[in-house]
Amino acid sequence: MAKAIPKIGSRKKVRIGLRRNARFSLRKSARRITKGVIHVQASFNNTIITVTDPQGRVVFWSSAGTCGFKSSRKASPYAGQRTAVDAIRTVGLQRAEVMVKGAGSGRDAALRAIAKSGVRLSCIRDVTPMPHNGCRPPKKRRL
């Protein structure tokens, strides 16, 4: 009897032995820079911190979700603080500007963590978009 020829595009899933949190091990190592810009985007559901070089190229980013927080805990101030510490420690910044956007609860905690981390801040700028009577806001929640 002839052997069956294996299909090239078989859909069989092969587990290679990656850990459950494979995202952390597959992430590229961040470039080390001394001067940069820290963008803090604090929404009501999450806090995202992006570190860029002075030209605006993204070097590293971190969010409360990638730091291990799930669901409503992503919106906590502690999650914002941990996210900021994670981003700064990985890149190794010495001097930075901070751009803050949004009104979430992780905003002030992230700013406090950046200030305590030892990074010299040249300026802190609030770049939250403010409408000049633009789109209609969502209706009030009734609980």
From Swiss-Prot:
Q: Which domain of life is it from?
A: Eukaryota
A Pfam family reported for this protein in Swiss-Prot or TrEMBL: Ribosomal_S11
State one molecular function term (GO). structural constituent of ribosome
For the keyword Lipid metabolism, the answer is no
List GO terms (cellular component aspect): chloroplast; ribonucleoprotein complex; ribosome
Q: Offer one example of a GO biological process linked to this entry.
A: translation
Give the UniProt subcellular location, in the record's own words.
Plastid, Chloroplast
User: Sorted alphabetically, which keywords does the UniProt record give?
Assistant: Chloroplast, Plastid, Ribonucleoprotein, Ribosomal protein, RNA-binding, rRNA-binding
Subunit and interaction comment:
Part of the 30S ribosomal subunit.
Q: Belongs to which family?
A: Belongs to the universal ribosomal protein uS11 family.
Q: State the PANTHER family in the record.
A: 40S RIBOSOMAL PROTEIN S14/30S RIBOSOMAL PROTEIN S11
Name of the protein in question: Small ribosomal subunit protein uS11c
